[in-house]
């Protein structure tokens, strides 16, 4: 749910600062959606590389953070960023990196939900099917509740930041856009903290 924190800013950024056609953006949307299409085979890869799940979460967090830092830099330090690549190229790189990081973490999280439900009780007895099913349903419910909570949190944050956007100066808008990308770094931080907790 928290992953959508930059969606609104991304739309405004494209509209106000980039000269990209609708056809180009549709094509970019296809490529950005490709990691989600590949989620199933990536899930199988995670099963094969299970002992490295922490590294996969870390890699996903680094990729997500890189995407956010690129956009923050492009918004707040545009002149310096444009000496390396043009704005459209930076935007494309950032747009393609974000879903790769999210999918990497999502497939690990999916696999971990199965592992999180115990198969045996504290006495070493196998848990009966109905109780096991109930625990799995509870685990899925908690996951969905956290997604809803994250989405609401992000919506409220965007409402607060952009409440007076029509009255903002250009400099204030740029700062607000950049701040949202900085706030989005909380997502990989949450992921990395999960490795150590």
Enumerate the language-model features and the residues they cover.
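Hydrophobic/aromatic residues within the transmembrane alpha-helices of Major Facilitator Superfamily
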Residues: 1-2, 34, 38, 66, ...
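Helix-loop boundary and gating motifs at the non-cytosolic
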Residues: 1-36, 97
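Juxtamembrane helix-start motifs in multi-pass secondary transporters
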Residues: 55-59, 180
């Amino acid at each position: 749910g928290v992953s959508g924190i930059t969606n609104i800013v991304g739309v405004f950024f494209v509209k106000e600062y980039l000269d990209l056609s609708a056809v180009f953006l549709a094509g970019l949307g296809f490529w950005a959606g490709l990691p989600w299409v590949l989620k199933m085979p990536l899930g199988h890869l995670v099963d094969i590389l299970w002992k490295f799940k922490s590294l996969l979460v870390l890699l996903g967090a680094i990729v997500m953070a890189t995407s956010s830092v690129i956009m923050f830099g492009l918004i707040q330090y545009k002149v310096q960023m444009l000496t390396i690549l043009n704005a459209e190229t930076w935007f494309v790189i950032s747009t393609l990196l974000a879903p790769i990081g999210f999918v990497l973490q999502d497939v690990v999280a999916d696999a971990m939900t199965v592992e999180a439900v115990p198969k045996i009780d504290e006495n070493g007895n196998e848990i009966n099917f109905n109780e096991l099913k109930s625990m799995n349903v509870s685990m899925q419910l908690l996951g969905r509740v956290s997604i809803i909570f994250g989405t609401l949190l992000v919506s409220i944050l965007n409402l607060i930041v952009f409440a007076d956007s029509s009255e903002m100066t250009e400099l204030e808008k740029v700062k607000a856009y950049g701040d949202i990308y900085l706030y989005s770094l909380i997502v990989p931080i949450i992921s990395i903290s999960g490795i150590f907790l």
